[in-house]
Swiss-Prot record:
Part of the ribosomal stalk of the 50S ribosomal subunit. The N-terminus interacts with L11 and the large rRNA to form the base of the stalk. The C-terminus forms an elongated spine to which L12 dimers bind in a sequential fashion forming a multimeric L10(L12)X complex. Belongs to the universal ribosomal protein uL10 family. GO terms for cellular component: large ribosomal subunit. Pfam families: Ribosomal_L10 (PF00466). This is Large ribosomal subunit protein uL10. The lineage of its organism: Bacteria, Pseudomonadati, Campylobacterota, Epsilonproteobacteria, Campylobacterales. GO terms for molecular function: large ribosomal subunit rRNA binding; structural constituent of ribosome. Keywords: Ribonucleoprotein, Ribosomal protein, RNA-binding, rRNA-binding. The keyword Ribosomal protein applies. It comes from Helicobacter pylori (strain G27). One of its GO terms (biological process) is translation.
Length: 164
């Protein structure tokens, strides 16, 4: 009875992971050997605020869920923490910022963007891109610049007339 219950739990876990992996635009796999529970919880809290999932998953279950979700095949070994979400840039930034703080205990091992394997260097390059919010701010600044310059010009003209 106990084994049947455990098997059912694993089947449900794989089905749940599969449904989440299908929707994810990015999936990163990291080694977290030696990282304290407190620090892993801090990572989870940061991730949760950005809509990113963080979970330690048995490699065999993760492999099955990834395969069923259509991801390219990865050779999963040792202990892994899986991070996934819909924003590749935010996820990459989160992982590399955390890795800088904990370089001896947290290392990116593999990355998948849109279900295709990408190199660690590629993920690092993506982490250096501006976020969606930063890009929107830049665009807004470009759009408002002509009006800002026009108003500044009118103000300078008014000041020049007042001086004369």
């Amino acid at each position: 009875m106990q084994k049947q219950h455990q098997r059912q739990h694993k089947v449900e876990l794989v089905a749940n992971l599969k449904s989440q992996f299908v929707d994810a635009k990015a999936l990163l796999i990291c080694d977290y050997k030696g990282l304290s529970v407190k620090k892993l919880e801090a990572l989870r809290n940061k991730a949760r605020n950005q809509g990113i999932k963080v979970q330690v998953i048995k490699n065999t279950l993760a492999h099955i869920a990834m395969k069923e979700a259509g991801y390219s095949d990865l050779d999963l070994k040792e202990t892994n923490v899986f991070l996934w979400g819909g924003d590749q840039i935010a996820l990459s930034k989160l992982v590399f910022d955390f890795q800088k703080e904990h370089k001896d205990h947290f290392v990116l091992k593999a990355g998948l963007f849109d279900k295709e394997s990408v190199s660690v260097a590629h993920v690092e390059a993506v982490s250096k891109l501006p976020s969606k919010e930063e890009l929107m701010g830049m665009l807004l600044s470009v759009w408002t610049a002509p009006a800002r310059y026009f108003v500044t010009g009118l103000d300078n003209l008014r000041k020049a007339k007042e001086e004369n």
